[in-house]
Structures are given as C-alpha cells and as structure tokens.
Amino acid sequence: MKLIVIAVGNRMPAWVETAWDDYAKRLPPDCALELREIKPEPRTTGKTPAQMMAAEARRIEAAIPGGALRLALDERGRDLTTMALSQRLEQWRAGGRDVVFLVGGPDGLDDALKSACDGQIRLSSLTLPHPMVRVVLAEQLYRAWAILANHPYHRA
C-alpha cells in the first residue's frame, strides 16, 4: 500500500522538501509516502476560479492511480483525531488499496472532483498555507503509523 499525496503547486521552499523527505523516509516500504506535484493553472489567464480548478482537476485525475481510495483535503471535511487517523490507516493497510490525498491549489479543489472522492477530511479548523499542509499531513501520517507500530515517536 502507498500513501500518495497529489498536491497542486510546485517550487516549494527547501524546508518543505526537507521535512517531507524526512517523514517519507521514516515510513516502511509497506506504507510508503509519495508526493505527486501538479502544475497549477496560471492565475493570469483571465479564467474564473471555477475554470482554473476544473483545469487542475483534470491534471489531478490523470495522476490518480486506478483503484485507489480518494480523500480530498477540504476546509469543510471531516475532523479526525490522530488516534482516529491511525485507526483509518490500519483499515487502509488491511484493505491493500493505495490511498490518495488530494490537496488543491489557491482556490481549492473542483467540486466535481471532491464529489468523486471516497471522503473529505481537514487537517485543521485553521487556514494553513499550502507548504505547511504538506508537512503537517506527512507528519500526521507518520505519527499514525508510529502509533500502530508502538513506536516511541508518539507518546499518548
């Protein structure tokens, strides 16, 4: 099983790549963490936000592996505690399907794309900058794995 984060945006600061790589390399191969960056639609084209999100959605769809469980990160998504995320991770691993987390661009994710997802979650009630979302998501996925592995990283 892979945990795949498909995120609109590229050219992240070096600290984001460093943090991402650190958490990704900590996870075992049977729970690998992978990032797929999607080129954002240029914001200078005169297109509406809906048109830009639709264009990004087409790129996102092309990056999603067949048969994967799809979860959209959205401000109106379901809150999960760290323990609940670890329980979900356990279920996902038992199911064997890849799990894809979709992170939208500056305008979010296209409504049709969100509707096609198996669920929607949010990382926080606070608004987080996109670079921080990647780091927080990677850390929480690692923490969820650490809980299941009884690793001392998470001390409840």
Curated annotation (Swiss-Prot):
The keyword S-adenosyl-L-methionine applies. Its main location: cytoplasm. Homodimer. It comes from Bordetella petrii (strain ATCC BAA-461 / DSM 12804 / CCUG 43448). It comes from the Bacteria. PANTHER family: METHYLTRANSFERASE, RIBOSOMAL RNA LARGE SUBUNIT METHYLTRANSFERASE H. It is found in: Cytoplasm. Belongs to the RNA methyltransferase RlmH family. SUPFAM superfamilies: alpha/beta knot (SSF75217). GO terms for cellular component: cytoplasm. It holds the Pfam family SPOUT_MTase. Its EC number is 2.1.1.177. This is Ribosomal RNA large subunit methyltransferase H. S-adenosyl-L-methionine binds at L73, G104, L123, S124, S125, L126, T127, L128. InterPro entries: Alpha/beta_knot_MTases (IPR029028), RlmH-like (IPR003742), tRNA_m1G_MTases_N (IPR029026). Gene3D superfamilies: 3.40.1280.10.
